[in-house]
Amino acid sequence: MEHIYKLLRSFKWDCAKYLYKNTLNFKVKRLRRKKNIRVLFAVAESATWKSDCLYKAMAEHPRFTPSILVLPDEQKEKTLLKEEVDSCFNLFCRKGYACTYPYQNGKLINIRKKLKPDIIFYQK
């Protein structure tokens, strides 16, 4: 019986590896076929922004459409959330980045439905 459980566990891991590998390969192949790749940089604070060179390189390339989404830091007080998002959003807009405001009608937007990014970089 022990031998059967061992075989089943091994089979389970082999199936999981196969599915992960093929799903990842499928997504990469699908992304490579796209003419325009939407890249979203999700940033919680302007001080953590370290992707300036990558953003500018993507902005210059005709195949990429980068944008920045300023996210509220949920670990801070609720009264400071909107103020920090506003100041960070204004900072990125002044620097000339394509920014998206995270609130619509007082609620956070659904990133997948509204922005439809192909690649998301999250910086905290």
Q: Where do the protein language model's features map onto the residues?
A:
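Membrane-proximal basic amphipathic "stem/tether" segments
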Residues: 1-36
